Amino acid sequence: MAGAKEIRSKIGSVKSTQKITKAMEMVAASKMRRSQDAMEASRPYAETMRKVIGHVANASLEYRHPYLDEREAKRVGYIIISTDRGLCGGLNINVFKKAVTDMQAWKEKGAEVELAVIGSKATAFFKHGGAKVAAQVSGLGDSPSLEDLIGSVSVMLEKYDEGELDRLYLVFNKFVNTMVQQPTIDQLLPLPKSDSKDMQREHSWDYIYEPEPQALLDALLVRYVESQVYQGVVENLACEQAARMVAMKAATDNATNLIDDLELVYNKARQAAITQELSEIVGGAAAV
């Protein structure tokens, strides 16, 4: 059994670590609330944009934008969102597993796969795995802006425009609640048709365009893709803070249990030492 001094040292070390994890838990809780506010503020815009685009995809348009047309999927692109930092449980690895599974399914069909990665964890993971990474961005911080993402999104859109990609997907963690973060894959291009009930009844939509339909749709559809990627980033950020808060709370609780166990061992060691000293005193007295 370890000596009392060594055990006291371990207890002190665990208590120091516990203070750190508790502080990180509190910081993550504060950041999570701010991230949730940002996510909830941007959700209505992203969801409304998705509905409008779904209607456009179902409409009989006088100008047919290339983003609306299905084509044989020989080259598939993914925009994969991750965190820049760790200590957030299995958040990143879960979304990576989902992405890799989907990518593998396309590869088995003979398609080539190309990526744009957001977040240093995704960059490290997919580059280490030998994936073809066309664009990357990291260091977005706790308040990401659309301007930070436009470069990487533009790279993938240009590839789609030039026929170097036939499908484009967005991979991210969707915030459900504090305890649940759902790895999600959304199709960005070609534009998915609306799944609303009126669309299922084959409702026909008529549009009046001002200015010309080509200029309007060219701008609208690019803005749609950008808005979905931005929403994915803020959703993933809220997931990151929630997962980190939960992970740090678990670490703090584990530290408490470990301290209790070590204190029990310490008390046993101290009791054994006292018993040994008493035995030596009694033995010495008997010898005299």
From Swiss-Prot:
One example of a Gene Ontology biological process annotation: proton motive force-driven plasma membrane ATP synthesis
Ribosomal protein keyword on record: no
Molecular function GO labels: ATP binding; proton-transporting ATP synthase activity, rotational mechanism
Keyword annotations from UniProtKB, A to Z: ATP synthesis, Cell inner membrane, Cell membrane, CF(1), Hydrogen ion transport, Ion transport, Membrane, Transport
Compartments, as annotated in UniProt: Cell inner membrane
Topology term for the membrane: Peripheral membrane protein
Gene3D superfamilies xrefs: 3.40.1380.10, ATP synthase, gamma subunit, helix hairpin domain
GO cellular component assignments: plasma membrane; proton-transporting ATP synthase complex
InterPro entries named among the record's database cross-references: ATP_synth_F1_ATPase_gsu, ATP_synth_F1_gsu, ATP_synth_F1_gsu_CS
Pfam families: ATP-synt
Subunit structure: F-type ATPases have 2 components, CF(1) - the catalytic core - and CF(0) - the membrane proton channel. CF(1) has five subunits: alpha(3), beta(3), gamma(1), delta(1), epsilon(1). CF(0) has three main subunits: a, b and c.
Similarity comment text for this entry: Belongs to the ATPase gamma chain family.
NCBIfam families cross-referenced by the UniProt entry: ATPsyn_F1gamma, PRK05621.1-1
PANTHER family: ATP SYNTHASE GAMMA CHAIN (PTHR11693), ATP SYNTHASE SUBUNIT GAMMA, MITOCHONDRIAL (PTHR11693:SF22)
Protein's job: Produces ATP from ADP in the presence of a proton gradient across the membrane. The gamma chain is believed to be important in regulating ATPase activity and the flow of protons through the CF(0) complex.
Protein name: ATP synthase gamma chain
Source organism (scientific name): Vibrio vulnificus (strain YJ016)
Originating gene: atpG
